[in-house]
């Protein structure tokens, strides 16, 4: 596979237009590792040829396969821990006080392989076990990703031992998963039932998503340019109910937009409240 500078630049432009991801100039190795097998299968010898093939058939399956390969990321259960503790100890109790009798509605944006929305669902179950009857109308979690392949896998709720080992305690494994044969586990139906998976591009219109009380958009914005990041944050704000909360990744910060979000210092961690 050839990754000449001109070919690589063409591919960078294509990927940013397709899904907003801005590849660094030193990411040829990443592109090669993600696309080598696909390009060999298609008989494509360079990134320039790949882009030309996609442009010739912009609605073809090759475009989706390439975007899938470049946006697929494995993640962890209960990543960074604190967001899920803040959710249980601060945000859900506050929601119940301010919205008696209403259903909690959450969005897990760019949910990848599904660990985040299922972790959220487990955290909600843990809250309900400790606070019987308080979340009377229950909760809905809308989980979106650009990758159709990942969403298909997410919906099954099945994971191998390697994925299970990444952040999941034995206690939660025993409580929330059923064994599905050697080295495989499935999320229990009660946890899966809260989660609705949808295909969604963060650059598209947000109108179909509706309004949310809480949005998790963690470890996603680092892949976008500053302008695209700002645009996405403004769009997310449009989906948040007044006073709703945005959770970003531990290494991400919301710089700017003081008219839209207020920083809330938790212990530990930081979240953002919609004005």
UniProtKB/Swiss-Prot annotation:
Keywords assigned: Chemotaxis, Methyltransferase, S-adenosyl-L-methionine, Transferase
PROSITE patterns (alphabetical): CHER
Keyword Glycoprotein listed: no
Top-level taxon in the UniProt lineage: Bacteria
Coiled-coil region(s): none
Pfam family, one: CheR_N
Reaction catalysed by this enzyme: L-glutamyl-[protein] + S-adenosyl-L-methionine = [protein]-L-glutamate 5-O-methyl ester + S-adenosyl-L-homocysteine
Biological processes per GO annotation: chemotaxis; methylation
Enzyme class: transferase
Domain CheR-type methyltransferase: from-to ranges: 1-275
Record-listed E.C. numbers: 2.1.1.80
Disruption phenotype: Mutants are deficient in chemotaxis toward malate and casamino acids. Mutation does not affect biofilm formation.
Binding site for S-adenosyl-L-methionine: 73, 75, 79, 116, 145, 201-202, 218-219
Entry function: Methylation of the membrane-bound methyl-accepting chemotaxis proteins (MCP) to form gamma-glutamyl methyl ester residues in MCP. Methylates the McpS chemotaxis receptor.
Oligomeric form and interacting partners: Monomer.
Protein name per the record: Chemotaxis protein methyltransferase Cher2
Source species: Pseudomonas putida (strain ATCC 47054 / DSM 6125 / CFBP 8728 / NCIMB 11950 / KT2440)
